[in-house]
Amino acid sequence: EAESLIPFAAIATVGDVMDLTDENRILVREGLRRLQNTDNPGLKALIRVNNLENREITAYHIGFILGPCLNASGRLSTAKRALNLLLCREEREAALLAQDLKALNDSRKDMTAKGVEEAVDLVENTDLGKDRVLVIYLPHCHESLAGIIAGRIRERYTRPAFVLTDGEEGVKGSGRSIEAYHMFRELVKCRELLTKFGGHPMAAGLSLPRENVEAFRRLLNENCPL
């Protein structure tokens, strides 16, 4: 029975961007082989709705097609929707659940693209573009997409980027960094402006009062070692 879980372990390993070395590599290789001919109604339906039937499923398909569909429910709704698909035993119900997750992921992609477009517009057409550390406030952005958008902005401008959005209490956000900028260390220098924060050299999450957003942007750039 444990062997039946190998495809799920492979999806989790690739979806969490784990290194594909040692036992991870073996697990993913075997999981992909089993995924190709899975008898799990939920996985079969998800493969079908993404037009991957009769195709060799690779780590790419998990990382960029199947995984994001499963992940979208946790970002925009509740992860229970993905769990319900994986536990489903009826093909007709599985087909409906899979279509629902794909639609949710398509919505996530559209929302992300809109957020990136708004962020780029602010960088290109305001004084933000002069900053070495980009702090972009998108009040209407879904908070679960802030990190994805920050990553896209970081890639586009090769600068550390924070994307902030309105949360239930104040402003919440995520940051994505570059090798030369220790993001967590720089947040420590701004801790008096923040409600809470956490992270590591390349990424961080934070919350702060709305009235501190501009001061946070200024202080990050004043302290910036780049």
Where are these regions (language model features)?
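Hydrophobic helix-and-loop "lid/oligomerization" segment in the mid-to-C-terminal part
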Residues: 2-211, 215-218
